[in-house]
């Protein structure tokens, strides 16, 4: 994750993305123009638009707890809760219905309460009411939008604006305040391809870690009670 943040900062905060010669754009004298909305210089021919021109916000309903089951079951789907991003100890499943919004592992979710504004991904299923989905209209923009929302400045802004409200909840109204720089199509595609490979690697490493933990938890009791031994 730190590597992804550094690349975003380099490309879209410092504007030192690779130019047509493979050199850092801004540091190599690439033309910058003043943008009145952002009160700063941005690369020539880049635009600034409201974030909600590129994304929409989606929420889910909360099923009754009586429908929860705690083992995989046909016709059921993983129920994603905020705590699942920190621990796998409370995995829950709910009936799959046509009214549920289902996300894949690369879709963007955000915390609405608690750590409001935190960006989440990596679990497939139906998300609960404490999370909101960021629906990116153009799939080629997904990694750029994820990085934008996950940047320190945007997270702090969204979190603080939620805490200042009477309901202390992230909503589409918070996102409506944000403007975002729109790079040219080549930069967007290059960034999407580059970052997607990093996300795949991150999820693969997480999966391997979970497998090792499960193996340890299965093997350790047998070693302790003598059901299994380690050969010399």
Place the predicted regions along the sequence by residue:
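Sequence-specific dsDNA recognition surfaces
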Residues: 32-38, 52-69, 75-107, 127-135
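Short amphipathic alpha-helical segments
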Residues: 38, 130-132, 174-178, 198
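Acidic, glycine-rich low-complexity/disordered segments
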Residues: 15-18, 46
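Extended non-membrane alpha-helical scaffolds
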Residues: 47, 71-72, 112, 138, ...
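Short coil/turn segments at secondary-structure boundaries
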Residues: 22-23, 64-72, 159-162
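Glycine-rich, mobile lid/loop segments that gate access to catalytic sites or pores
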Residues: 3-4, 8-15, 22-29
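A short beta-sheet element
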Residues: 81, 99-155, 159-173
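Non-catalytic DNA-recognition/assembly elements of restriction-modification systems
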Residues: 1-7, 29-62, 185-231
């Amino acid at each position: 994750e730190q590597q992804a943040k550094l690349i975003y900062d380099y490309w879209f905060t410092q504007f030192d993305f690779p130019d047509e010669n493979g050199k850092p754009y801004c540091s190599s004298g690439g033309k910058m123009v003043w943008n009145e909305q952002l009160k700063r210089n941005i690369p020539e021919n880049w635009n600034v638009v409201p974030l909600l021109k590129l994304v929409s916000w989606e929420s889910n309903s909360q099923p009754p707890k009586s429908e929860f089951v705690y083992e995989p079951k046909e016709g059921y789907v993983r129920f994603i809760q905020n705590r699942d991003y920190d621990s796998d100890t409370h995995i829950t499943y709910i009936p799959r219905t046509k009214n549920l919004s289902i996300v894949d592992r690369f879709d963007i979710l955000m915390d609405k309460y608690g750590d409001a504004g935190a960006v989440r991904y990596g679990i497939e299923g139906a998300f609960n009411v404490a999370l909101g989905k960021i629906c990116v209209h153009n799939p080629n923009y997904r990694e750029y939008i994820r990085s934008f929302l996950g940047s320190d400045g945007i997270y702090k802004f969204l979190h603080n604006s939620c805490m200042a409200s009477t309901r202390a909840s992230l909503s589409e109204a918070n996102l409506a305040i944000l403007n975002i720089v729109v790079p040219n199509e080549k930069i967007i595609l290059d960034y999407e391809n580059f970052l997607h490979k990093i996300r795949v690697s991150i999820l693969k490493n997480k999966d391997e870690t979970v497998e090792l933990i499960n193996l340890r938890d299965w093997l350790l009791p047998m070693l302790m009670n003598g059901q299994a031994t380690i050969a010399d």
